[in-house]
Amino acid sequence: TQYIRFFMDSNRYTAFEAFVNQYKEIEVFHKVSGQACYLLVSHFTDVTFPLFIESLSNWGRYSVETFVADKLNHGDD
């Protein structure tokens, strides 16, 4: 799982949103306020993720956090 914060380099929001919505691997696609313009949660493979990021970089800048392990413990053990 990848968590992507995306920062637009232009105001072509509608075209960018159409681009992102082409990908079935994207589970969450939110327009946000704060540091980033959008927050995405995706499930690309190690092979397809670099291809997506290369295309994404045509639209702006991004930062990526990759899911490693769920550490939430509600004491149910």
Mark where each language-model region is:
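A compositional/biophysical signature of low hydrophobicity enriched in polar/charged and small residues
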Residues: 1-77
